[in-house]
């Protein structure tokens, strides 16, 4: 599976699920229950994907990529499987953000 992120939302490409379109997606910046900073992807009120980003600078860098260079700015994050633990996902995001900030 692969997450494609742009300023309008997220497209999830996977062999098991249909393509998710940006208008079906909502982001949340934190979980109200415990104020934990997260980037969560909801599709039709189902939490499809959630990544804790506890580092505020990294979270802001990541979110700024969604707006960089307008709507043609797309960030692809390849995922071998959706069943990553939070530490593994954190590392994937760190690498993806670093690569995209260099461009």
PLM feature spans:
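A broad, low-specificity signal marking well-ordered, structured residues that form hydrophobic/aromatic
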Residues: 3, 39, 75
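Terminal and domain-flanking low-complexity segments
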Residues: 46, 51-103
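Secondary-structure transition/turn motif
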Residues: 13-16, 42-46
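A structural detector for beta-sheet-dominated domains
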Residues: 6, 42, 78-80
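Conserved beta-hairpin
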Residues: 1-29
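Short acidic, Gly/Pro-enriched loop/turn segments at secondary-structure junctions
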Residues: 32-42
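Generic domain-boundary/flexible-linker signal
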Residues: 21, 36, 50-52
